[in-house]
Amino acid sequence: MKNSVKELRKSRNLRQEDLAAILGVTRQTIIAIENNKYDPTLELAMKISEYFEMSVNEIFRLK
């Protein structure tokens, strides 16, 4: 699954640490998601979509 988390994070001038704290996860989790090494749980995907005010489908898409 590809995603636009990195681009969205940068558009808000957030560091990986900042987004991790907002979402209640580790910086390593954010790194893995941004590098397409980890597909987030549905709960985490929903938190990300709520934070960025976008649908899960807009942020995460099949490769």
What are these regions (language model features)?
Residues M1-N3, K63:
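Absolute protein N-terminus
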Residues S4-I22:
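Short basic helix-loop element that most often maps to the first helix and adjoining turn
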Residues K10, Y38-D39:
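Short amphipathic helical patch at the helix-1/turn junction of helix-turn-helix
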Residues E17, Q28, N57:
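Residues within helix-turn-helix
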Residues V25-Y38:
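Recognition helix of helix-turn-helix/homeodomain-like DNA-binding domains
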Residues A45-S49, F60:
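Hydrophobic micro-packing sites on short alpha-helices
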Residues E53-K63:
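Short C-terminal boundary/hinge segments that cap the last helix of small helical domains
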